[in-house]
């Protein structure tokens, strides 16, 4: 009987070896190695300029005054993004919101954008959000607005791509009568 048990156990081990069962993982690479197989995004830096396309106001803002604060909501403007990357180079609809001091014009600005590239990207657009501060520049009648933005591609060949950028605007007047901005950023794609 002992011999029969030994033979059965031996055949069981041989059978398991033949079908590939073992206590070793059959994964071709370890979990640590699997992480290195994931694609890292391609980073494409870009620079550019941001300025209004006359007549740039598409929709007037709703403005409320609260003490020294001027609260603006829903101003829609048409702008030109002249960028070194043809994926970002195009026109932008910018919805601006903000809270500014009535005397100094300083405050916070935030909003959302839709950028339509001039390049044929299969109908895709960029959608994003931004926030920042506007402060007096030291030159009378000029303010500096520094913005940080994040966005993503929707549709066409830019679907799934992302961008991150910084914009520095020199703004004329309070309320603004015009501006010229510099853009620096990166596009992230897989």
Range-by-range predicted roles:
Residues 10-13:
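Short, linear, compositionally biased motifs with a strong N-terminal bias
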Residues 17-20:
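C-terminal motif of bacterial Sec signal peptides marking the signal peptidase cleavage site
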Residues 1-8:
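Bacterial N-terminal signal peptides that target proteins for export
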Residues 24-190:
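Beta-strand-enriched cores of mature, soluble protein domains
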């Amino acid at each position: 009987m002992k011999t029969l048990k030994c033979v059965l156990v031996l055949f069981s081990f041989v059978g398991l070896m033949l079908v590939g069962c073992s206590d070793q993982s059959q994964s071709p690479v370890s979990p640590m190695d699997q992480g290195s197989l994931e694609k890292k995004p391609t980073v494409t830096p870009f620079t550019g300029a941001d300025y209004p396309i006359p007549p740039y106001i598409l929709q007037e803002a709703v403005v409320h005054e609260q003490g020294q604060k001027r609260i603006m909501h829903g101003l829609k403007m048409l702008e030109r993004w002249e960028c070194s990357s043809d994926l970002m180079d195009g026109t932008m609809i910018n919805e601006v919101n903000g809270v500014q001091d009535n005397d100094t014009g300083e405050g916070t600005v935030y909003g959302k954008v839709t950028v339509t590239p001039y390049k044929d990207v299969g109908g895709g657009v960029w959608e994003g959000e931004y926030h920042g501060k506007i402060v007096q520049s030291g030159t009378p009648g000029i303010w500096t607005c520094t913005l940080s933005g994040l966005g993503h591609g929707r549709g066409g060949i830019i679907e799934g791509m992302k961008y991150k950028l910084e914009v520095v605007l020199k703004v004329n007047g309070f309320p603004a009568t015009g501006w010229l901005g510099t853009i620096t950023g990166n596009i992230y794609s897989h």
